[in-house]
UniProtKB/Swiss-Prot annotation:
This is Actin-binding protein WASF3. Keywords: Actin-binding, Coiled coil, Cytoplasm, Cytoskeleton, Phosphoprotein. Phosphorylation by ABL1 promotes lamellipodia formation and cell migration. Downstream effector molecules involved in the transmission of signals from tyrosine kinase receptors and small GTPases to the actin cytoskeleton. Plays a role in the regulation of cell morphology and cytoskeletal organization. Required in the control of cell shape. The lineage of its organism: Eukaryota, Metazoa, Chordata, Craniata, Vertebrata. It comes from Mus musculus (Mouse). The keyword Cell cycle does not apply. PANTHER family: WASP-1, WISKOTT-ALDRICH SYNDROME PROTEIN FAMILY MEMBER. One of its GO terms (biological process) is actin cytoskeleton organization. Residues 170-443 are annotated as: Disordered. It comes from the Eukaryota. GO terms for molecular function: actin binding. Disulfide bonds: none annotated. Residues 411-422 have a biased composition (Low complexity).
């Protein structure tokens, strides 16, 4: 059915019934025909006015466009006359700063919409019957939809077509994304390489230093190197300890309970409490060196040490005799070192001051719980060979284990400044302080928050790109064509599945 834009009334000039009682019928028909012609002329004049009005509007729009184009041409003509290529060159910066001309074509669309309806069609539309007043039922609906749209909806077909086009465009985009991911997976399938374990070169060289038949077990070597692995990993304090121990070459025991092998010689009973208390603090600050630990692990036989020097008089023994500075012995070993069944202890060797022995403070000496005499004396250890050039004293071969000594005298651990309350206070762990709020401490949180905000912002930008710019046919079709024929997948970087969590 064609849509009539302009209709001329009346359509029939001479068609009509003559009234009764007319004497001259010919004159009546002529007059009615002339009146119909006049009405048609008036209708034509009205349509002519509408047509010329539309032509005037079109001509006015054309004049505006031509005028703007003429203004641009005039400005270009002025610039061309002022530009002298022989004097001044056009800089690339000026060219890059200005955008190139791009024509924006306006496509004709929504011709039959209510806004673009011409006046004759609007008149015909107004003459038609009105729909029933179903819009008064809209406030009573739960879904808040317009009640008139269930009877007549001018945008129904457009909305249906728009939904279908957008769904097809989204399906095309997902298909391209799936193909792109499939190509990426096919291109990146390669063998996963295993990470090579780091090697400890120093430990390997230490193992190679021994003969094949004398190399220690892996477990022993790991425990030894756990206590003192290498010189490069020791602190300056530990290096000074090891230097002192190697200089005096006294028997040393590792810090492990299974490798503690004390030597238990016998001495007089009167000197046991004195020497056990005076040297208990001094022996605690030293740790066994790696060299002595290796000797303990290997259990290699050593030559017996030279006999001790002659015994000092009884009068000067109580004031001058001091236990040898065995840096690796435990308190129980020192007490057993001077048992009541042997000769009195020998005088100490000359002390060589070092960075650790010259300045000793009570707080720097860690305390160790003494082992029982019965458990310690179960594993005897042969004495080590003394270093050349230094006088070293060592106990004779081990004998039967003596009974554990009694409680020390009044000048025992309680009166020693090394084992007083300051040591317990220094041993007590300090309470954890609350973390100080600093800008640097919040750097990681700020970075994470910035990344999250950036992701959300990019997601919103991509969602804005997905939405059509205009709610019209041309924009929707252009976007679908762009998705089908484009090689890039910029609009589909962020999938809704990636943001579901």
């Amino acid at each position: 059915m064609p849509l009539v834009k302009r209709n001329i009334e009346p359509r029939h000039l001479c068609r009509g019934a003559l009234p009764e009682g007319v004497t001259s019928e010919l004159e009546c028909v002529t007059n009615s025909t002339l009146a119909a012609i006049i009405r048609q002329l008036s209708s034509l004049s009205k349509h002519a006015e509408d047509i010329f009005g539309e032509l005037f509007n079109e001509a006015n729009n054309f004049y505006i466009r031509a005028n703007s184009l003429q203004d641009r041409i005039d400005r270009l003509a002025v610039k061309v006359t002022q530009l002298d290529s022989t004097v001044e060159e056009v800089s690339l910066q000026d060219i890059n700063m200005k955008k190139a001309f791009k024509s924006s074509t306006i496509q004709d669309q929504q011709v039959v919409s209510k806004n673009s309806i011409p006046n004759p069609v609007a008149d015909i539309y107004n003459q038609s019957d009105k729909p029933p007043p179903l819009s008064i039922l809209t406030p009573y609906r739960d879904d808040k939809k317009d009640g008139l749209k269930f009877y007549t909806d001018p945008s129904y077909f457009f909305d249906l077509w728009k939904e279908k086009m957008l769904q097809d465009t989204e399906d095309k985009r997902k298909e391209k994304r799936r193909q792109k991911e499939q190509k990426r997976v096919d291109g990146t399938t390669r063998e996963v390489k295993k990470v090579r374990k780091a090697r400890n070169r120093r430990q390997e060289w230490n193992m190679m230093a021994y003969d094949k038949e004398l190399r220690p077990d892996n477990r022993l070597s790991q425990s030894v190197h756990h206590g003192a692995s290498s010189e490069g990993s020791l602190s300056p304090d530990t290096r000074s300890h090891t230097s002192d121990v190697t200089d005096y070459s006294y028997p040393a025991t590792p810090n492990h309970a299974l490798q503690a092998q004390p030597a238990t010689p016998s001495y007089t009973a009167g000197d046991a409490p004195l020497h056990g208390t005076t040297n208990q603090g001094a022996e605690h600050e030293y740790r066994p060196s790696s060299a002595s630990a290796r000797h303990m692990a290997l259990n290699r036989p050593q030559q017996p040490p030279p006999p001790p020097p002659p015994q000092a008089p009884e009068g000067s023994q109580a004031s001058t005799s001091v236990a040898p500075a065995d840096y690796g012995m435990l308190p129980a070993q020192i007490i057993e070192y001077y048992s009541p069944s042997g000769p009195p202890p020998p005088p100490p060797p000359p002390m060589i001051p070092s960075a650790q022995t010259a300045f000793v403070s009570p707080l720097q000496m860690p305390t160790q719980p003494p082992f029982p005499a019965s458990a310690v004396s179960t594993y005897p250890t042969p004495p080590h060979q003394p270093s050349t050039g230094l006088l070293a004293t060592a106990p004779p071969p081990p004998g039967p284990p003596p009974p554990p000594p009694g409680p020390p005298g009044p000048s025992s651990l309680s009166s020693s400044p090394m084992h007083g309350p300051p040591v317990a206070e220094a041993k007590r762990p300090e309470p954890a302080q609350p973390p100080i709020s600093d800008a640097r401490s919040d750097l990681l949180a700020a970075i994470r928050m910035g990344i999250q905000l950036k992701k959300v912002q990019e997601q919103r930008e991509q969602e804005a790109k997905r939405e059509p710019v205009g709610n019209d046919v041309a924009t929707i079709l252009s976007r679908r064509i762009a998705v089908e024929y484009s090689d890039s997948d910029d609009d589909s970087e962020f999938d809704e599945n990636d943001w579901s969590d």
